[in-house]
A protein has these predicted regions:
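Short acidic-hydrophobic, aromatic-tinged amphipathic segments that line or gate anion-handling sites
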Residues: 85-89, 145-154
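Glycine-/small-residue-rich active-site loops that bind phosphorylated ligands and cofactors
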Residues: 20-21, 43, 113
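Acidic/glycine-enriched connector segments
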Residues: 5-7, 27, 34, 49-124, ...
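Generic N-terminal amphipathic, Lys/Arg-enriched alpha-helix
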Residues: 7-23, 33-39
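Short active-site oxyanion
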Residues: 40-43, 145-146
């Protein structure tokens, strides 16, 4: 049986990326959060610092909803502008919950953790948009199915 979302149900976007973002990268993530909130998306992220904190700040500026899935059981370590927090107490394993929660995943900057989240997203069939992050090419040199590169948040 296939689940069907009710008409008008919110769409979810998972935003992943650098936990230590440069000011430029944080500005892009904040702008992305603003744009997603303006369009009515619920934003899911890892709930901590860097890109996660910046995207939540952008969402809050525009009155949107953000959900942070934390790696630990301590809600006090969450980014301050999140609407809701989920304490997973799962460490890096929470990355699967972050990417599985979105209808699409947007990667902004990042290092090895972000690369692992991109792989997890594709393994569960989520489309991925790459914004100032890893350049990924399959062994045959072609395009990766379900992965697109973007130059700006717009």
């Amino acid at each position: 049986m296939t689940a069907v979302e009710p008409a008008g149900a919110p769409r979810y976007v998972s935003v992943i990326g650098a936990s230590r973002a440069t000011p430029e990268l944080a500005a892009k993530a904040e702008e992305l959060g603003e744009l997603l909130a303006e369009r009515g998306f619920v934003v899911v992220c890892g709930g901590r610092s860097g890109v996660m904190e910046a995207v939540a700040r952008g969402v809050k500026k525009k009155g949107g909803v953000s959900i942070g899935i934390l790696p630990e059981a301590d809600r006090l370590r969450a980014a301050p502008d999140l609407t809701y927090t989920v304490c997973s107490a799962m460490g890096y394993a929470r990355n699967l919950s972050v990417v599985a929660s979105g209808d699409v995943v947007i990667a902004v900057g990042g290092a090895w953790g972000t690369l692992s989240e991109i792989a997890l997203a594709r393994n569960v069939g989520k489309p991925v948009i790459l914004l100032d992050t890893w350049s990924i090419t399959p062994p045959d040199g072609g395009e990766l199915d379900g992965v697109r590169r973007a130059g700006t948040p717009v």
